[in-house]
Amino acid sequence: WTGNSMEEKLFDSFDMRDENGKLTNAGALLADDSPIRHSRLFCTRWNGLDKSGGMVDALDSAEYSGSLIILLNEGVSFVKRNMKTRWKKTADSRIEMPDYCERSVFEALVNALIHRDYLILGSEVHIDIYDDRLTIYSPGGMPDGTRIQERDLSSISSTRRNPVLADI
């Protein structure tokens, strides 16, 4: 679709309403006026290489709430606004080289929003931009409760924490 709103039929076809017509959790997270209070995204552009950058800790920050579509769009916009774009001249044009590939930021943020653990109250997805890196934090650990440090990475199978969201 091309907007932030969904038609009623879409809610039914993607199992985002129950048999009584009430939104499921996935439906509520995708609704334009998301009723889920902890569907939030915190974004910060830090001054330096860590969260204590000297005289000024943060150069920019924003807190967004609303549907996952809104959070995704606002998060990508925040990163684009706060990253550097270098460029070099060629014989007949200019090549722009942004710090981060927009498609990669989009994909990482989609994964963070879709696969986060929404049962952890008082938590939110974070985007932190430093002078040398971008980090995206998503609440929740491994779906089976193990620690990733204790696992053989080659044997971890793909598991979707929120399958309805992942299907959409």
How does the language model describe each region?
Residues 1-164, 168:
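Active-site helix-to-loop segments that bind/position phosphate- or nucleotide-bearing substrates
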